[in-house]
A protein has these predicted regions:
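Short, well-structured secondary-structure segments
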Residues: 82-89, 123-127
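Active-site region of glycoside hydrolase catalytic domains
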Residues: 1-53, 77, 96-98, 107-501
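Active-site mouth loops of central-metabolism enzymes
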Residues: 54-67, 145-147
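Glycine-rich, proline-tolerant flexible connector loops at the mouths of alpha/beta enzymes
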Residues: 88-102
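Alpha-helical scaffolding within the catalytic cores
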Residues: 68-72, 298
């Protein structure tokens, strides 16, 4: 029977904008994320062109990996990490995005990080652009809407590829690139918000601008991949998709067709371009219906053909249902992708519906479509952790969530899926990208940092730390119920109470 491969890449995932902090240290510039205020589940964060005195911008300090990287990497090694997903902050290398020469202090920082990972034989998995678009490029070009950004991106890519060619093997070009197919992608992913001041949920939606920006990201990704294939054959280049698995709300053929349409636009379009090297025919009708006309230059199609990915990665947190019935109003509150609540699934406190079986289904669908090695590079449960007086976090609800998803990954491997690794999101507590809060915690490691900006940043191991340590030690077999830490009856009760019906 097929099991997780012996060289399976167990680890954890982070992003510089949510974790690194030190936003203006050693010559770093401001990114789009640095211009986002704090928020909550009920009050959306805002983006401001100018920094407001007295307003908290949580990404500026985050949980301070910049000054704690040795301690944090030691914790990752203690758990047994084989891979460490992180991003390079573009603005630490090119502060405004438009400099001719890179910032040496920024490059030296990542040298130190990669050397520290190598000390523990941990493989870095580096996202080149993970919501760290220089704000200078927003002001100059309206973010990725400006084709000029491609050249600035490639200058950045050329520098980091050359600098870290002997230290990094696995690269991802853009984080959750398909978020640009949805209005929410305008802020962090595309940066098409020049002059906007207000809640991130109220940015005026302009599909023409979003999809033109996506076209420029496709070109930038393909150029980076071709450069890697031609000059650095040791590199393995991947994409990263936000996979929002969708089911028909009913077996009504109208619902099935609506689900197919949404799956194509949200989940398949971007990866079809990045994996196959061309625009799929189904997108033509969508563009016609929306009045979208992509401005292409001669040679664009060839660039896309020559820059396809080596492996496919994605985030998986939830699923949702789609319906063609306008009378159905049961929306999934808090669900990043909207859509209709699935009555068969429970949800987290943030309304994200929990669907472990959906991960197995998703892995099979992606594998059947592309026949490329796959990696789940984000997955996890955002929760309000309680710190006991003796410094413990009994997060049995997180263990329950993760063990069920790992079990379904194992089933997908038995189905024949080529799965190369797993990096749960926010293995150490980081700032939430969607809400800008610290209260929504994912980590195996608790960081004493709070929504009012206070906290001494000390790191504490949660119960899930020891559980995941055992999962890695046993190459996934330790994920089954009864393995890892023992749970008390009160902890089981806590886990049951955590979930609610969506």
């Amino acid at each position: 029977m097929r099991t997780f491969r012996e060289d399976f890449l167990w680890g954890g995932a982070t992003a510089a904008n949510q974790y690194e902090g030190a936003w203006d240290t050693d010559g770093k510039g401001a990114s789009v994320s640095d211009h986002c205020t704090n928020g909550s589940h009920t009050c959306p964060k805002r983006v401001t062109p100018e920094f407001e005195e007295g307003t908290l911008y949580p990404s500026r300090d985050a949980t301070d990996f910049y000054h704690h990287y040795k301690e944090d990497i030691a914790l990752a090694a203690e758990m047994g990490f084989k891979v460490f997903r992180m991003s390079i902050n573009w603005t630490r290398i090119f502060p405004t995005g438009m400099e001719e020469e890179p910032n040496e202090a920024g490059l030296a920082f990542y040298d130190r990080v990669f050397d520290e990972l190598a000390k523990y034989s941990i493989e870095p998995l580096v996202t080149i652009s993970h919501y760290e678009l220089p704000y200078g490029l927003v002001e100059a070009y309206n973010g990725w809407y400006g084709r000029e950004v491609i050249d600035h991106f490639m200058r950045y890519v050329e520098v980091i590829f050359d600098r870290y060619q002997d230290k990094v093997k696995y690269w991802l070009t853009f984080n959750e690139i398909n978020s640009g197919t949805m209005p929410m992608g305008a802020v962090l992913s595309l940066g098409t918000i020049r002059g906007y001041n207000g809640p991130v949920t109220e940015v005026p939606d302009e599909p023409q601008i979003r999809f033109q920006g996506l076209h420029h990201q496709f070109l930038a990704s393909a150029k980076a991949i071709r450069l890697a294939h031609e000059k650095y054959p040791q590199f393995k280049m991947g994409n990263m998709n936000l996979f929002a698995t969708k089911y028909p709300y009913t077996c009504n053929p109208a619902d099935v067709l609506e689900c197919q349409k949404q799956m194509r636009i949200v989940n398949w379009f971007c990866s079809d371009v990045q994996a196959r090297g061309y625009y799929p025919t189904y997108i033509e009708r969508y563009f016609d219906e929306k009045g979208i006309k992509i401005a292409k230059e001669p040679g664009d199609d060839e660039i896309l053909r020559n820059g396809t990915i080596d492996f496919y990665t994605f985030s998986y947190y939830m699923s949702a249902c789609e319906t063609a019935d306008p009378e159905v109003t049961a929306k999934s509150g808090g669900n990043l992708v909207g859509a209709v609540t699935n009555p068969y699934l429970k949800a987290s406190d943030w309304g994200w519906q929990i669907d472990p079986e959906g991960l197995r289904y998703t892995l099979n669908e992606i594998w059947d479509r592309y026949q490329l090695p796959l990696m789940v590079v984000e997955n996890g449960l955002g929760a309000r952790d309680e710190l006991t007086e003796d410094g413990k976090v009994h997060d049995s609800y997180r263990i329950d969530y993760l063990e069920k998803h790992i079990a379904q990954m194992a089933e997908a491997v038995r189905d024949g899926v080529d799965l190369m690794g797993y990096t749960p999101w926010g293995w150490i507590d980081v700032v939430s990208a969607s809400t800008g809060e610290m209260a929504k915690r994912y980590g195996f490691v608790y960081v004493k940092k709070y929504d009012d900006g206070t906290g001494d940043l000390s790191r504490l191991r949660k119960d899930s730390f020891y559980w995941y340590q055992n999962v890695i030690r046993e190459n996934g077999t330790g994920a089954s119920r009864g393995q890892g830490i023992c749970r008390s009856r009160s902890e089981d009760h806590q886990r049951r109470r955590f979930y609610r019906r969506g």
